[in-house]
């Protein structure tokens, strides 16, 4: 018989009774605040069409690299989990794939995925027993049946989750038709996009040739000419802003920036376009384009996010058989102080610019990132990211960053996920961890309770809204409830 599934109301709170009491009170202030999700990777077509999700495997398992990478590490084939390969979606029975997942669910004990998924199973679907092999079919049937109902369509879940803003991420070579459909539908949900130009900046990316072709189509520019290439970016950035975007996102291998002259930059671009691509030239161009994007932000106001330091697609065999984003991305050492200096020397004191830095290298928190953000007015620190968005990772971030950068040089939490149903769980974890961190400071008499109460609301709601300029969005983009309240 499966074990009972229950979520303790004090989960993730300190074990010391006095400190735990403070954490409870702080969490109570933010538990029901709206979710601000300013950076993520959900599919905008979900909200444009509002079509029902297919089944448990299609929604929860096959797209989630957090899940299938763990099972793959234990010898489970991706085909058995119905994960898409370059040949297409395998013909594996989705029920059988779910059974495989259920029989291996114990592998996630101690991981954030264990917390998130059990939150989804308990709070979203109402399960009262842990998932295991014996109840795999019951889980599959109940989840799949629920997904067929109107209450579990994407827009209904968006409203149920109390999401105020949700940002997706698209490239300049991609259509924004789904965002247009959302806006024209009359639905009040605030779903916006973000500008991610990596595929038309990184000449080492195998997607680059096709992305350039589509970039030319979407922008109407000759993107193989340097000046027209930059103009294409400006035009597409404005199109993204018209679709609600307030930020751009840059996932380069390193944090390198450069400040070449116009002549040098054009010569480098021309060389790359002609096919003379070397690792050194590709890296220099990526570095220069971060500075070019920053210069454009001075004019159009997009907040820059820099997500460096991932060795993408480390497993070459899996890349060849299944393509990108199959759980084989590995964190790398990342240097920021010298890497960012060219950009910061050029633009680091300009009040029109805002850059949010992320890292997969936790050794840089106190040595590089906190001192940089604690000095340069253009810099803020993004929350613990990807491999570190666990309760422990969130606590390490606060402990190592706060002493130098404080709280107000950070931007609150963002979930950065494709897993739509896990968004409330991820934000709940962040709210609990921040409550626990502040509770400890109150218990140690490092701040009083009133200060902690102000801070927990800022960390949860006000800071992400301000950092991503969501408090400046046009009236059409505000939820109907907020528009009505303002009238």
UniProtKB/Swiss-Prot annotation:
InterPro entries: Metal_Hydrolase (IPR032466), Uronate_isomerase (IPR003766). GO terms for molecular function: glucuronate isomerase activity. It comes from the Bacteria. It is an enzyme of class 5 (isomerase). GO terms for biological process: D-galacturonate catabolic process; D-glucuronate catabolic process. It catalyses: D-glucuronate = D-fructuronate; aldehydo-D-galacturonate = keto-D-tagaturonate. Its EC number is 5.3.1.12. Keywords: Isomerase. Transmembrane segments: none annotated. Pathway: Carbohydrate metabolism; pentose and glucuronate interconversion. Belongs to the metallo-dependent hydrolases superfamily. Uronate isomerase family. This is Uronate isomerase. It comes from Caulobacter vibrioides (strain ATCC 19089 / CIP 103742 / CB 15) (Caulobacter crescentus). The gene is uxaC.
